[in-house]
């Protein structure tokens, strides 16, 4: 079994707190992707983004100032 380095042992909560204010990609269960600046996230994975772009089937569909995503719709969050 391979051991992990210190960087890999960070818990998800600490990771998400550390990327607040950074550019992120949020993919929803529906396949829609939002790219924007992470403003806040709570224990239910509810997410607030600013300067957000919405992508459907890989194509830019719309740009928003602010977006709120309910946590049960989130498939994953990725730091850009």
From Swiss-Prot:
<dbReference type="GO" id="GO:0003723">
    <property type="term" value="F:RNA binding"/>
</dbReference>
<keyword id="KW-0507">mRNA processing</keyword>
<keyword id="KW-0819">tRNA processing</keyword>
<comment type="subunit">
    <text>Component of the heptameric LSM1-LSM7 complex, which consists of LSM1, LSM2, LSM3, LSM4, LSM5, LSM6 and LSM7. Component of the heptameric LSM2-LSM8 complex, which consists of LSM2, LSM3, LSM4, LSM5, LSM6, LSM7 and LSM8. The LSm subunits form a seven-membered ring structure with a doughnut shape.</text>
</comment>
<dbReference type="GO" id="GO:0046540">
    <property type="term" value="C:U4/U6 x U5 tri-snRNP complex"/>
</dbReference>
<dbReference type="Pfam" id="PF01423">
    <property type="entry name" value="LSM"/>
</dbReference>
<feature type="domain" description="Sm">
    <location>
        <begin position="11"/>
        <end position="80"/>
    </location>
</feature>
<keyword id="KW-0963">Cytoplasm</keyword>
<dbReference type="InterPro" id="IPR016487">
    <property type="entry name" value="Lsm6/sSmF"/>
</dbReference>
<dbReference type="GO" id="GO:0008033">
    <property type="term" value="P:tRNA processing"/>
</dbReference>
<dbReference type="GO" id="GO:0030490">
    <property type="term" value="P:maturation of SSU-rRNA"/>
</dbReference>
<protein>
    <recommendedName>
        <fullName>U6 snRNA-associated Sm-like protein LSm6</fullName>
    </recommendedName>
</protein>
<dbReference type="GO" id="GO:0000932">
    <property type="term" value="C:P-body"/>
</dbReference>
<dbReference type="InterPro" id="IPR010920">
    <property type="entry name" value="LSM_dom_sf"/>
</dbReference>
<dbReference type="InterPro" id="IPR001163">
    <property type="entry name" value="Sm_dom_euk/arc"/>
</dbReference>
<dbReference type="InterPro" id="IPR047575">
    <property type="entry name" value="Sm"/>
</dbReference>
<keyword id="KW-0747">Spliceosome</keyword>
<keyword id="KW-0687">Ribonucleoprotein</keyword>
<dbReference type="GO" id="GO:0005732">
    <property type="term" value="C:sno(s)RNA-containing ribonucleoprotein complex"/>
</dbReference>
<comment type="function">
    <text>Component of LSm protein complexes, which are involved in RNA processing and may function in a chaperone-like manner, facilitating the efficient association of RNA processing factors with their substrates. Component of the cytoplasmic LSM1-LSM7 complex, which is thought to be involved in mRNA degradation by activating the decapping step in the 5'-to-3' mRNA decay pathway. Component of the nuclear LSM2-LSM8 complex, which is involved in splicing of nuclear mRNAs.</text>
</comment>
<keyword id="KW-0539">Nucleus</keyword>
<keyword id="KW-0698">rRNA processing</keyword>
<dbReference type="GO" id="GO:0005730">
    <property type="term" value="C:nucleolus"/>
</dbReference>
<keyword id="KW-0694">RNA-binding</keyword>
<keyword id="KW-0508">mRNA splicing</keyword>
<comment type="similarity">
    <text>Belongs to the snRNP Sm proteins family. SmF/LSm6 subfamily.</text>
</comment>
<dbReference type="GO" id="GO:0000398">
    <property type="term" value="P:mRNA splicing, via spliceosome"/>
</dbReference>
<dbReference type="GO" id="GO:0005681">
    <property type="term" value="C:spliceosomal complex"/>
</dbReference>
<dbReference type="GO" id="GO:0005688">
    <property type="term" value="C:U6 snRNP"/>
</dbReference>
């Amino acid at each position: 079994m391979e051991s992990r380095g210190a960087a890999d042992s960070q818990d998800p909560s600490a990771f998400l707190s550390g990327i607040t204010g950074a550019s992120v990609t949020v993919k929803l269960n529906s396949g829609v992707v939002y790219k924007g600046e992470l403003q806040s996230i709570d224990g239910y994975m509810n997410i607030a983004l600013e300067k957000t772009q919405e992508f459907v089937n890989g194509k830019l569909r719309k740009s928003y100032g602010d977006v709120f995503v309910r946590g049960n719709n989130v498939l994953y969050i990725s730091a850009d």
